[in-house]
UniProtKB/Swiss-Prot annotation:
The lineage of its organism: Eukaryota, Fungi, Dikarya, Ascomycota, Pezizomycotina. Induction: Expression is induced by an intimate physical interaction of the fungal mycelia with the bacterium Streptomyces hygroscopicus. Expression is repressed by VeA and MvlA via histone 3 acetylation by the SAGA/ADA complex. The gene is orsD. Residues 137-189 are annotated as: Disordered. This is Orsellinic acid/F9775 biosynthesis cluster protein D. GO terms for molecular function: DNA-binding transcription factor activity, RNA polymerase II-specific. Residues 172-183 have a biased composition (Polar residues). GO terms for biological process: regulation of transcription by RNA polymerase II. PANTHER family: ORSELLINIC ACID_F9775 BIOSYNTHESIS CLUSTER PROTEIN D-RELATED, STEROL REGULATORY ELEMENT-BINDING PROTEIN ECM22.
Length: 501
């Protein structure tokens, strides 16, 4: 059976010769167990995804360990990158490595030698990534070599291909880009007119839109007085600020070409920032660590906000659609100071929701929000039935009480600072048990998180925060995927898409 292309933009190809389904945008084969999440990554939602999955289930897809690899004389497989690697020439050994560094490791571990003559160059491919990577040698034609995109310089002093260290789809993190170690491949920041224009934009515009990690006030003073002086001493940190400025410009481009250029520069600045941060994270002082952590979290949010499709220029080496709800939660929570959980106060705190007086709310919007949160436990009980664990009920009530109080902060003004602070600090005030329930996809806890997204994340976007553009809908769609399906739709209706004020 010849390979067959299908799906939106014809991104999927089934190759019956090997029993694999290749994604042409991500450039690797998809495991059966990761099919649903992979299609969602490409923003293929429920109806279209179910139709695609039904069709793919009719195909004979093999598990990675069962796929027979092509012989070395075979031409490259269409849709997979060709890597300039090495083949071990030791007697009885034909091990393949993507870099000379890894080949030397193979010699030490398998042959007890360090002889660079025991290898020859080879063109390699792999169907899968992460823990299921299995290289095979191919023989490109002249035409293939002209079009070939080598993903590594294969020099011991330069960045090695790092497909082995990327997690597969089941691991939750996957990247179609190549991770490099620090070296000449990382772009440098030259002090030219373009760089100066990005810095000027950060000082005059971007800094005014960013949250402050220390309090709910405007972040402009924090970024100008605390972040910029440190960035002037650390080039990699300055790259983080320039990346945020480029992202901000990409969010509001003058035209499509300008938008793509800003995305490209954002990705380059981000790479140098992350390279420097990885090198110095363990030795940085507390102040520098706070600024760098905040930049990293905000760049991840910007990456999600700007990723219109998986093939976009990537600002961060991860999917444009967050693979897991937990990655969104941890990113948002990390933008504000951590707070020690008060587990002993859970019961007392939970009763606050029962004592709410909506007449004391600051305005009609907050009164409506408190009414809805107050009524939510009863609606969940009607839908999910009598709870088995009374302690978990108290945990949910405590989380709702904290949400009501954080909404008071978020809706106190039309400014981004209070809106972000209320949105992010909620996660520092909920019990640890609540976070455990969310991680286990406990339906009632997901309904509570859905209200956080519809109310507080949506509120932050409405206040003008470009960093969370579309994030509320992404969270709600992620949650909807995890909720049990029922005939009358009661569970889905609990994900209150319409309660945002």
């Amino acid at each position: 059976m010849p390979p067959v292309r299908f799906g939106p933009r014809k991104i999927l190809e089934y190759d019956g010769r090997y029993g694999v389904l290749i994604c042409h945008e991500c450039r690797y084969a998809i495991q059966k167990s990761a099919l649903q999440s992979h299609l969602l990554r490409h923003k293929i939602y429920r109806a279209d995804r179910q139709q695609l999955v039904a069709m793919i289930n009719e195909l004979d897809l093999l598990e990675p360990d069962d796929v027979l690899l092509p012989p070395p004389e075979s031409p490259p497989i269409d849709g997979l990158p060709v890597i300039a690697g090495y083949r071990c020439t030791a007697p009885g050994c034909a091990n393949l490595c993507a870099s000379l560094k890894r080949m030397k490791g193979h010699w030490r571990e398998s042959h007890g030698i360090a002889d660079a003559s025991l290898a020859r160059p080879a063109k390699l491919q792999t169907f899968f990534r992460g823990t299921k990577i299995r290289y095979f040698e191919v023989t490109p034609t002249t035409e293939d070599e002209d079009d070939e995109e080598n993903e590594s310089e294969n020099d011991e002093e330069e960045g090695d291909v790092d497909l082995e260290e990327q997690e597969d789809d089941n691991g939750g993190r996957q990247s179609t880009t190549v991770t490099t170690s620090p070296g000449p491949s990382a772009p440098s920041v030259n002090v030219d007119l373009e760089t100066l224009s990005y810095f000027h934009h950060f000082m005059s515009a971007t800094s005014l839109t960013l949250p402050c990690p220390q309090d709910m006030q405007s972040g402009a003073q924090y970024w100008k007085e605390k972040a910029v002086p440190q960035a002037l001493q650390q080039r990699w940190l300055m790259c983080g600020l320039l990346a945020l400025a480029a992202c901000h410009l990409a969010a509001f481009p003058d035209n499509a070409a300008a938008g793509q250029q800003h995305r490209k520069r954002a990705a380059e600045f981000s790479l140098e920032f992350r390279t420097g941060w990885r090198e110095l994270a363990d030795t940085s002082g507390e102040g520098l660590r706070e600024v760098a952590t905040e930049i990293e979290c905000l760049l991840r949010c910007a990456h999600w906000a700007l990723a219109e499709s998986p093939c976009d220029q990537r600002i961060m080496p991860e999917p444009g659609v967050p693979e897991h709800l937990q990655s969104i939660i941890s990113t948002i929570q990390s933008t504000v100071p951590a707070a020690a959980p008060h587990e002993a106060e859970t019961s007392a705190y939970a009763t606050r929701i029962l004592r709410w007086n909506t007449s004391e709310a600051g305005n009609s919007v907050l009164a409506e929000i408190r009414n809805r949160l107050h009524d939510l436990p009863a609606r969940m009980a009607d839908t999910f039935g009598r709870p088995e664990n009374i302690q978990d009920v108290l945990v949910l009530l405590s989380a709702l009480a904290a949400m009501g109080e954080c909404c008071d902060t978020s809706f106190a003004s039309e400014e981004v600072g209070p809106a972000w602070w209320g949105m992010a600090t909620w996660w520092t005030r909920v019990p640890l048990r609540f976070k455990e329930l969310v991680a286990r996809h406990y339906p009632a806890s997901l309904v509570v998180v859905a209200h956080w997204a519809a109310l507080m994340v949506n509120r932050t976007e409405r206040c003008g925060c470009w960093l969370v553009k579309g994030l509320a809908m992404t969270i709600l769609l992620r949650i909807a995927e995890r909720l049990p399906e029922d005939d009358d739709g009661n569970v889905q209706r609990l994900v209150a898409l319409t309660i945002a004020a």
